[in-house]
Amino acid sequence: GEAVGLPAQQMGNSEVGHLNLGAGRVVHQSLTYINRKIKDGSFFKNKCFLKVIQHVKTNKSKLHLLGLVSDGGVHSHLDHF
């Protein structure tokens, strides 16, 4: 949950616990970071990603995206699919 940098009611794992253990502060996890960037719109303004999209459009080429899709919520989340 929020005490270890995850959304409320989101179960973590040992990795999340180890990252937060002794930090003296909340270590926000990737899930929280990505959620925040999507919510404030900055996720869709990433210069590197926009440059790649423009290259694909200009050159009529293909873009292959790889990633994780899981309901686990630590390394990936279904909401980001």
From Swiss-Prot:
Pfam families: iPGM_N. SUPFAM superfamilies: 2,3-Bisphosphoglycerate-independent phosphoglycerate mutase, substrate-binding domain. Substrate binds at residue 75. Keywords: Glycolysis, Isomerase, Manganese, Metal-binding. The keyword Zinc-finger does not apply. Pathway: Carbohydrate degradation; glycolysis; pyruvate from D-glyceraldehyde 3-phosphate: step 3/5. Mn(2+) binds at residue 14. Its EC number is 5.4.2.12. One of its GO terms (biological process) is glucose catabolic process. Binds 2 manganese ions per subunit. One of its GO terms (molecular function) is phosphoglycerate mutase activity. One of its GO terms (cellular component) is cytosol. It is an enzyme of class 5 (isomerase). It catalyses: (2R)-2-phosphoglycerate = (2R)-3-phosphoglycerate. The active site is at residue 14. Its cofactor is Mn(2+). Belongs to the BPG-independent phosphoglycerate mutase family. Monomer. Catalyzes the interconversion of 2-phosphoglycerate and 3-phosphoglycerate. This is 2,3-bisphosphoglycerate-independent phosphoglycerate mutase.
